[in-house]
Design a protein with these regions (language model features):
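Metallocofactor- and cofactor-centric catalytic cores in central/energy metabolism, strongly enriched
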Residues: 2-180
Length: 180
């Protein structure tokens, strides 16, 4: 079995809907027939198998139909939450179109609307209530192989003033650019 079909580094992959909810591993409709069988995905996805290029084309078509930059930001955030590989392929292949959406200027508006557009947690929130427990909070991060972090206190986000936890869009956006 390939890494996608059974395990990564000896760790078994999640199966079925658990795999489809894991953005680091989910390939959406790009899972092959063999992968669908091995990973319990048959019947959980539309039967047609798409290439990543097909998926990119569909993402761009949907993205370009969005009426506002904030709608485009929400669309890309949802993709990021579903399929990170596809998200980064779209960003890398279309930087001029994507960068102003995932970072400035749109990320400022996204931070201001964070409480209204929040869909899935990204990042690690450390607050004053965590005083004396920061190490325990850091241990809650699910990934051990961390190559880079971006930290903000939420103050003076893009000249917008103190955004507090709503400023999380800044480190998420920066890491998206650095990763791409």
């Amino acid at each position: 079995m390939t890494a996608r079909e059974g395990s990564v580094g000896g760790t078994p992959l999640p199966r079925g809907t658990a795999l489809l909810r894991e953005p680091l591993l989910n390939k959406g409709t790009a899972f092959s027939a063999a992968e669908r069988d091995a990973l319990g995905l048959r019947g959980l996805l539309p039967p047609r198998i798409n290439t990543q290029a097909d998926q990119v084309s569909r993402v761009l078509e949907n993205f370009r139909r969005k009426p506002t930059d904030l709608d485009k930001y929400i669309n890309l955030a949802a993709l990021h939450d579903r399929n990170e590989t596809l998200f980064y392929r779209v960003v890398v292949d279309n930087p001029d179109e994507m960068m102003p959406i995932i970072y400035t200027p749109t990320v400022g508006q996204a931070c201001q609307q964070f409480g209204h557009i929040f869909q899935r947690p990204r990042g690690l929130f450390v607050s004053i209530e965590d005083l004396g427990r920061v190490e325990a909070v850091l241990r809650n991060w699910p990934h051990r192989d961390v190559a880079m972090i971006v930290v903000t206190d939420g103050e003076r986000i893009l000249g917008l003033g103190d955004q507090g936890a709503d400023g999380m869009g800044i480190p998420v956006g920066k890491l998206s650019l650095y990763t791409a």
